Amino acid sequence: MRNYELVYVVKPNSDEEVREAILNKVKEVVATDGEIVKVDTWGTKKLAYPIAKFTEGFYVLVNFKSAVDVPKEIDRNLKINENVIRHMIVVA
């Protein structure tokens, strides 16, 4: 298993239920072949530049350990979700 770090930015106008649903989906995918180490909610922050006409975003950092194929599945799920405006997964 490898250590990964995921940061994703959710639309600032999305409600708490949407944010929780996104995080629960990430947790569900990681649980298939890995474990969540830490979840850190940074809250709403100003973006360095506008993304999809938004100047702010709600940031979430997730550290997890998993097999190599899990980040690909998380990436696929976050690309599909219209409330996620940007995400990045790196090997920690």
Curated annotation (Swiss-Prot):
> What Pfam family is a match, any one?
Ribosomal_S6
Per UniProt, the keywords (alphabetical) are: Ribonucleoprotein, Ribosomal protein, RNA-binding, rRNA-binding
**InterPro entries in the record, alphabetically?**
Ribosomal_bS6, Ribosomal_bS6_sf, Ribosomal_S6_plastid/chlpt, Transl_elong_EF1B/ribsomal_bS6
Q: Provide a Gene Ontology MF annotation, just one.
A: small ribosomal subunit rRNA binding
Instruction: Give a GO cellular-component term.
Output: ribonucleoprotein complex
Report the record's Gene Ontology biological process terms: translation
Function, as annotated, reads: Binds together with bS18 to 16S ribosomal RNA.
Can you tell me which family this protein belongs to?
A: Belongs to the bacterial ribosomal protein bS6 family.
PANTHER family from the UniProt entry? MITOCHONDRIAL 28S RIBOSOMAL PROTEIN S6, SMALL RIBOSOMAL SUBUNIT PROTEIN BS6M
Report what the protein is called.
Small ribosomal subunit protein bS6
Species the sequence originates in: Clostridioides difficile (strain 630) (Peptoclostridium difficile)
Q: What is the lineage of its organism?
A: Bacteria, Bacillati, Bacillota, Clostridia, Peptostreptococcales
The encoding gene is: rpsF
